[in-house]
Amino acid sequence: MSPKNLLKGFKRPKKIEFTTDVNTPNYGKFVAEPFERGIGTTIGNSLRRTLMSSIEGAAISAIRIEGVSHEFSYIEGVAEDVTRIILNLKQVRIKYEPEDKEASKVIHLELKGAGYFRAADLAVDSSIEIMNPDLHIATLNEDANLIMDLEIQRGRGYVPAEDKKKDIEVLGTIPIDSIFSPIQKVLFEVSETRVAQRSDYEKLTMEVWTDGSVSPEDAVAQAAKILKDHLTVFINFEEEIEEEEEELDEADEKLKAALSKHVEELELSVRSTNVLRSLEIDFIGELVKRSEDEMTKSKHFSEQSLLELKAKLSSMGLSFGMRDF
C-alpha cells in the first residue's frame, strides 16, 4: 500500500488548546478539534487508558525499621503499629527524577522524642520533592526512637508487595505496595463541532488530574508518545521523513475571511444597517451567531430586513445560528 495521500481529506487538529485560566499543577483541561467522526472517541479513550496505566512516577517500595522484623509489630513510643505506618506511607506522593531511571534511593531517618512524623520529613535532600507534605505518618511520644530506611523507586502502575519479596536482600526489609502512577483521574467528552457548513465533526475535551509530580500537559504528551511508539510496528511501509508543511484548508480560510468582514461590506439598506448598529453588531462573525428569533425580537427589525440579511448571508455561504466556528 502506498503511504502517499493517506491523510488527504482528513480533518485533523492543528494544535491542542489548553484552558490556561483553569489549569493548575494538578489539573489540566484541553480541547482538540476537529476530528473525523469516530476518531475523537478513539483517541480520547486510548489516551485515557494510557494515562491511567502507563505514566511513570515514584513511590516508596520498601522499608526497614530498626528492631522490627515484620509488619505486624509495634514500636515503642509510637502510637501507630507498623501496619498503619505502612498504609500511611503508601499514600505519600513523591517527585523523584534521577538521571538513571533505574536507580533507587534509600532515605535514612532518625526521629527521637515527642512529635509528629509527616511526609515532609522524607524530603532529606533536593532530589526528593514531597507533593503532600502534610500527610500524617505516625505520632511519637517522649520515649520514641524511630530509626528507619525507606527505598524510593520509579515505576509504572501498581506493584504489590508480594511481587517484590524475591528481590529483598537485606534482612528485616519489608516490601510495601507501590502506587507509581501520578495520574489520579482522567475524563474525556466528545461533542459535535462545525467546520464550514458541516457539523458532524468531533471535538475532544479532556480533563486530567495528577498528584503534582507531573503536569497534566506533560502527562498527555507522554501518553501520546507511548501510543505513537506502540503503533509504529503496524506500519508496513517506509515513511519519508520530511518537514510537514501546514496545509491551509481553502474553505476554512474563506470562512474566516468572510466572518472577519465589517457588516458595512454587505451593502445593506439604511434601515437594516441602523438596526445592526443599534444591536452593536459590527462584524459578520457577530451577526451569524445570532438566531433568526433573536433578530426578529429587536424593536425595529422588520421581515423585510430579515429577508435581506438572509439573502446576503446565503450568497456568502453563511446563515444565522452559526455558533460553532
Curated annotation (Swiss-Prot):
GO CC annotations on file: cytoplasm; DNA-directed RNA polymerase complex
Gene Ontology MF, one: protein dimerization activity
One GO BP: DNA-templated transcription
Catalyzed reactions per annotation: RNA(n) + a ribonucleoside 5'-triphosphate = RNA(n+1) + diphosphate
Region entry Alpha N-terminal domain (alpha-NTD), spans: 1-238
Name of the encoding gene: rpoA
Family (UniProt): Belongs to the RNA polymerase alpha chain family.
Annotated region (Alpha C-terminal domain (alpha-CTD)), positions in chain: 255-325
Pfam families: RNA_pol_A_bac (PF01000), RNA_pol_A_CTD (PF03118), RNA_pol_L (PF01193)
Protein's name according to its UniProt entry: DNA-directed RNA polymerase subunit alpha
Assembly: Homodimer. The RNAP catalytic core consists of 2 alpha, 1 beta, 1 beta' and 1 omega subunit. When a sigma factor is associated with the core the holoenzyme is formed, which can initiate transcription.
The protein's Enzyme Commission number: 2.7.7.6
Keywords attached to this entry: DNA-directed RNA polymerase, Nucleotidyltransferase, Transcription, Transferase
SS bond list: none
Coiled coil location: none
Domains as described in the record: The N-terminal domain is essential for RNAP assembly and basal transcription, whereas the C-terminal domain is involved in interaction with transcriptional regulators and with upstream promoter elements.
Species, as recorded: Leptospira biflexa serovar Patoc (strain Patoc 1 / ATCC 23582 / Paris)
Function: DNA-dependent RNA polymerase catalyzes the transcription of DNA into RNA using the four ribonucleoside triphosphates as substrates.
CDD domains cross-referenced by the UniProt entry: RNAP_alpha_NTD (cd06928)
InterPro entries: DNA-dir_RNA_pol_insert, DNA-dir_RNA_pol_RpoA/D/Rpb3, DNA-dir_RpoA, RBP11-like, RNAP_asu_C, RNApol_insert_sf
